[in-house]
Amino acid sequence: ILSGLVGSEMCIRDSGYICDSCATQAYEITQEALGEGRKRAGATKLNLKELPKPVEIKKFLDQYVIGQDDAKRFLSVSVYNHYKRLLQKDSGDDVEIEKSNIIMVGSTGTGKTLLARTIAKLLHVPFTIVDATVLTEAGYVGEDIESILTRLLQVADYNVPEAEQGIVFIDEIDKIARKGDNPSITRDVSGEGVQQGLLKLLEGSVVNVPPQGGRKHPDQKMIPVNTKNILFICGGAFDGIEKKIAQRLNTHVVGYTASQKTAVIDKNNMMQYIAPQDLKSFGLIPEIIGRLPVLTYLNPLDRNALRAILTEPKNSIIKQYIKLFEMDGIKLTFEDSVFEYIVDKAVEYKLGARGLRSIVETIMMDAVSYTHLTLPTIYSV
């Protein structure tokens, strides 16, 4: 910025001088730092009249998410039906279509968050991610349930009608499961208590939200937000739920057809048989399961899937690095052995697709550090 002082017009202030170029640059940096909310004001918004069909939604997801075809089909249809129902208020129809919130079950790094974020990107709706583990019942240390809507409002730049058509992804929903099959006698402020608190948000109600987040206070001005048209997508790893599924299937496989039914069950992929009663056995209360009627699962990623994720998606980490080096006039190439090494480490660490980025970042750190000093115009890893 100091180089801009030479030959530039100066803005004079009591405490000193600042050149016109610096003032402009400082303003641009400040505006960028204020967040994406203001940028969204001029961005394309959701057009219900031109809502993408399920096949178009899935095609868009295919560009960013490798595999998980079953989950993508479920999401595409459910999201389409959710936003299509918003047209009902203009139709004068007496039949009220209820919204279908979604719950996705899958291990870490299988693409749950990416799927939700990509759908929001396609539809141009406000999107926020909430970690269920930080939520507590009202009156206890932690974040209130209403903080979910505060985050959504912030993303929408406090445009309430826009926020009321947004998408909320609640991650780690399995971490607020109650500890036993029976209702808790003692206060479970971060488990069953949070599930109870989420009910009114999921089913659709008007919630008074503190404008700047934090706890509610008497005489504080509130922002009413109707959650009726907000799509809630919940995700969790549900570690150990395969045992619940197996127990349920074993109790059903009795009688003279037992051997035949047992042969059909794929013990290597028990997740495909997941049902709402398994979520109940895991510790979700029946009321919250009923408000998450669309249940889908994501398969663990094998070596082939991880290899494809590394290079094929539109925003893959490898393509990102190639673009970054290209901006410095350097052509970056990778040998196949490097890809195999990255996949080996990702399998070893058991972090799924999420682990790919950290491994690539570690490998590329030295190259990026010396990009402007030592690297030739063609660089191979």
Where would I find each of the regions flagged by the language model?
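Single conserved hydrophobic/aromatic residue that forms the stacking wall/gate
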Residues: I1-G7, I12, H372-V381
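Short conserved motifs of the RecA-like P-loop NTPase core
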Residues: E56-F60, T333-K345
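Glycine- and Gly-Pro-enriched alpha-helical subdomains that act as flexible
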Residues: A308-N315
